């Protein structure tokens, strides 16, 4: 018997942000991690210009052995230990061909679509795909890795700036008969600009932009412009983009 589909209400929080930058999203339990990656990009306001990975926390993680031969995209699932002592799985997709670039997604922040998209960088080779071991995120569902309320996983975006997000399941409910998922339910604060140096670089940028006497004020204004509002979040705009995404 097929498992009954549920709706997961998840909170996505950008780690290190104060006050928290977060989104609450309702998704189907059968959404794959590959699809969830795209939903996170849209809901947060990223542009999918860099690589990503999911870290699935586990008390007793065991690596999965799986070959992915003759592919231009390698996938890897391995056990890692984070600096704070946490251990978990990593499921990630890694292009091994430097001609492959991540596919941009439409952003909820209009200025991203006209500027940051032009700065999509090409990836570097990651090695022989026949030697990689792992599991494709496109074959793993959220319901499989987060089976209950309070289940968590880490989503890391951009291995240079290291934007780490915590995804927590807050509710598991029955789908509404006319419900359309995914849908963003709420959120706070704007997404940081791409390539600004991570969470610490972002707050340094805000300090510089807000202080005309700051040594980098002029430089930051020229880079970010005078229209960036760190408090802005447009729920309707996010859901309009998610509606397009649902249609493929």
Residue spans of the language-model regions?
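Short linear regulatory motifs enriched in tryptophan with gly/pro/ser
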Residues: 1-248
């Amino acid at each position: 018997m097929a498992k009954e589909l549920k709706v997961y209400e998840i909170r996505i929080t950008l780690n290190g942000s104060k006050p928290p930058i977060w989104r609450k999203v309702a998704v189907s339990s059968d959404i794959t991690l590959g699809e969830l990656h795209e939903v996170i990009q849209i809901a947060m306001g990223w542009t999918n210009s860099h690589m990503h990975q999911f870290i699935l926390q586990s008390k007793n993680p065991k690596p999965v052995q799986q070959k992915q031969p003759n592919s231009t995209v390698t996938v890897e699932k391995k056990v890692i230990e984070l600096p704070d002592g946490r251990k978990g799985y990593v499921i990630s997709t890694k292009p091994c061909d430097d001609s492959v670039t991540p596919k941009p997604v439409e952003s909820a922040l209009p200025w991203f679509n006209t500027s940051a998209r032009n700065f999509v960088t090409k990836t570097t080779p990651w090695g022989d795909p026949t030697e990689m071991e792992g599991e494709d995120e496109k074959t793993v569902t959220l319901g499989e890795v987060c089976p209950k309320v309070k289940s968590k996983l880490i989503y890391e975006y951009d291995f240079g700036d290291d934007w780490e997000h915590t995804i927590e399941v807050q509710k598991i409910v029955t789908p509404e008969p006319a419900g359309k998922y995914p849908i963003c339910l709420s959120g706070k604060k704007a997404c940081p600009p791409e390539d600004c140096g991570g969470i610490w670089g972002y707050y340094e940028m805000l300090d510089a932009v807000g202080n005309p006497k700051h040594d980098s004020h002029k430089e930051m204004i020229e880079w970010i412009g005078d229209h960036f509002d760190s408090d802005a979040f447009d729920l309707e705009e996010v859901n309009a983009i998610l509606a397009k995404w649902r249609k493929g």
